[in-house]
Amino acid sequence: MLLTLGTIVESQTPPAAVADSIYKAAVNGGPESWKTAAEELRALLPGTPDSPTMHALLGGLYLRLGEQDSSRSALERAIQIDSTLASAHFGLGRVHLELRDKPKDAVRHFEAALRADSTYADAHAQLSLAYQKQGKRRLARRQADLAIRYEPRLALPYRILAETYAEDKNRAASLIYFKRYLDRNPEDQETATTFCYELLEEEEWEQLFEVTSRLNDSRTLPLLATALIHKGEHEAALAAFRDYMATLEEEEAELYDDITPVGLKREALAYRTTIGKTREAFLDRFWMIRDPFKTSGGAMRRAEHYRRVWHARRHFGIKRFPWDRRGAVYIRYGEPFWRSTSKDMNAIVPAEAQQVQDLMASRLYGSESIDHTFVGPVYPIRHQSDAGLSLSGSPNGANGTLGLQGYKPVTAGSDWSTVPWESWIYTDIANGIEISFTDEFLSGNFDYAPIPTLSEDDFARFERGSGSPLTFISRLTELAPAALVAHVVSEKPDRYDLALLEPLHFYYEALAYRGEDGQTDLQINIALPIDNVAMDEDPDTTVVVERRVVLLRGAQEISRSVENLAVGINDMNRDQGLLAVERVDVKVQPGEYELRVQASRRNTNRVQVYGQILELEDFGKTDLMLSDLQIAQNVVEANPDRPSKFGRKGWDIQPAPARSFRAGEPLFVYYEIYNLNRDEFGQTRYQIGCEVETTTSEGKIKIPFLAKLRKKQGEKIGFEFEQTGTETDENDFFELDLSEAKPGSYELRMRVTDLTNQQTTSKHSMFTVSPTR
């Protein structure tokens, strides 16, 4: 921090005025400027040897230059001349605090400065820092508050408040002051990094993104990536991790791509035997297969893997490279549902975790475990050998202490463990497992809790009772953490938890038409219910929904379309059952594909993805063919002056992806017919037939809806129509009259017969009718 000298209110002699000018000109420069200014002030001293201002200014320059003895001598001389000179006391305090690292000695000088000027904000701030360095957080906060009262623009007091509140585990207050500090001093990368780790612990993802996106310290790239993961921006998160990996040594960087901790043996072997582009292609496929949504090219799962590796290096790789056993489990399975450690015992055990504990305890200790509450490992770990020695013929003592002579579980009433321990519970792996880790050598290197060794006293107690030591040893071996993990890895090599996500239900439909050059025009219509997108706390606002449409063939991504959709939310469109409709067009070769359609509201955990296997027929054949039937809300002739995003072949088709209508509403069906044959007069003649069925308790029954076919010369009503024309391909629509329709689900079948050669083709579609309001 720069030295701020108090305004000297005294009669200035010309040399003193010159000295003040020299100081001000040099204060914002560098060491050379300070050194030159100090020489100029020394040259002025013989003319004004008793000027406290001259000595104080000279001491300030020496302080900047880090010259402890010269600075201290000049400032002490200034105080000898004028003991009320606040700036001299302040400077001397900083000499003790910064150059001598003696915060206790600095306190009395800052206090002297404040006796001379109680509103001296910098002195309050430096006194606060001196108290903080002595561990006197309460006094430090009091002085920081005073500094802010007198000068709110100072940055240092906010940092001290942030750090002291963080030390007191008051993260809410700490975050407030860290943010205010960085607003005033955004260039402090070190403090910003500390702040980011606080935000990480508090899971303040939006703030973490805001801060880390402004930093250029490579150490914060994993923090930025983590924030991006929680924002749903997985490709950007993956890019941030790769930028971070590029700054690491080769041995460290390779840890992130190595899939050995999460892959099967054959996959790990394949990884080790590939290099270069072949390895990258292998990794792309590996992560795509494991990606639960398959809408980001595997980035969703891969970015999470990188995050876990970074977390394991940071938390579990301190004493062992690259990480101890906890890190290996964390990379494979992620954050446990419940965790308790010997350093931070977690006595709040959710019902799901308690169920896992109780089942394991019952298998190990029988009915004796019923009255015990477990707050640590259920599996017995090393304890003091004289704790609970009275075992009554079983591994459970008559005094209620479970376990063996030297190994016991950790319960609410008994923790005599002699080794550091951690207990992790995953409720969604193998119907729930507990994994216990211990640091047997007190080295900070945790491994699976070892299988206990029975003492002679343990065997003797079994012999006196009805239990079998061999049976108990068998259970200990079967339920040992190492054995449990080895068993579940063979069935579930990795885990990706989606439990924190909330569903965002929407509707979609996929329709296929003939395209150009032998391709198929795949049309995906999406309808987002406004009421599903909106949240209760939303004001009248516009929110962003990211829409993704991905087409896959196996693990290969054929096409990906991503777009951010602005959805307006206000009192007028809430609770109205309204839909925001979007259309995506994909040109693709015929064949079998997997379609993935995803919608996620940005900056929330609301997301939904739907998958569907598509068999896209080859419309390039010469036989009579019919496109998919599009159930629509309306079909009108397209206006060439106002093109619509829902237009196709001269028609403006308003999609109805939900395919839900109310009785009395019109229902339109758009279709395309291909490869009609002309007769000897160049005419085409074909017949369209429609059937509508619904399913009741008595089975399927046909419904006599009237269909109204659009014709250039008028409209024709009926369930079979004969049409004539001259084109071999037709695209048209008809309207169904739902005025008499009852609520329920209906199947529409359309059949086309070419009356020239008697070829027939058909398609079907579904729709529902809801009760009128």
Question: What annotation goes with each model-predicted range?
Answer:
Residues 47, 81, 116, 150, ...:
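Structural marker of alpha-solenoid helical repeat scaffolds
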Residues 29-39, 64-77, 98-112, 133-146, ...:
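Structural signature of tandem alpha-helical TPR/SEL1-like repeats
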Residues 448-773:
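Intrinsically disordered, low-complexity terminal regions enriched in Ser/Thr/Pro/Gly
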Residues 133-135, 167-169, 200-204, 218-520:
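Residues within mature, well-folded domains
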